[in-house]
Amino acid sequence: MSKAFKKLALASLLSTAALGAQAAALDLSGWSPLTLTFPGGQPAGNWALEPGNTAVTQTVNADPSFYLNNLNQTSYTIQGSWQVLTASDDDYMGFVFGYQNSSNFYLFDWKQASQGYVGTNAAEGMTIKKFQGATGNGLVDLSLADFWENEVNFGDMSVLATNHSSTAGWADNVLYDFLLDFNLTPGVMRVVVKQGETTLWETTINDSTFTAGQFGFYNNSQERVRYAGFEQEGGVIVDPNPVPEPASLALLGLGLAGLAATRRRTSFAS
């Protein structure tokens, strides 16, 4: 294990202990925006961070757009509030988790009203999806249709759970609460969406494709979506480039030594 990773892991443990005592709203200033701007689509997202760094609003009608926390982590609970601050549109808002790269991740999205677009249909309501692209580049592997469809598997997108109905859409200017338990039990995720004290949806997903990754905010073709007051408990940082343990290094050394000896014997024979 590298010294840098040990320091990162220690910082994570100290942060977890502090959160256990009193969770504070996350500082979003270190998060990063990303938009998949497809040909013929809409502009890039504009994520406007508010003073205090605990709230951010995506202000424009954009192609699929993310605001990522840059932490490859597992075994955490995160929760906070979000809402649409306009009555001028009816599209997608939600969250991304287990994010590996721009074509491999889990997605929770919520559509206000049913609508067809780019040859696919979006039903009114909430959906949890999984995206698995071959190259890791969303602009190569995915399409606007992959993001829009929410009833059946499409392209590199698989539907994991749905809460669709004619009354399941989000409402304008209404505050909602989101909670995610991610991999507290290996291979298990739990999502809870509430409006005040009313639980609108609670679902558990069993899937171990991505057991660590980044968390972030997401919306698609929806302006004026505000996310605020998110808090996290737990969280274990996972080193994306682990250094081989000593035993592995020893085996690697023996293998290289054997290869060198073979080459010497071959040279002598010739």
Language-model regions, residue ranges each:
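C-terminal membrane-anchoring or membrane-association module
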Residues: 260-270
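Gram-negative bacterial Sec-dependent N-terminal signal peptides
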Residues: 2-22
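Positively charged n-region of N-terminal signal peptides that target proteins for export
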Residues: 1-7, 245, 263-265
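Short linear Ser/Thr-Pro motifs
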Residues: 17-21, 248, 270
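Extracellular glycan-recognition regions
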Residues: 24-242
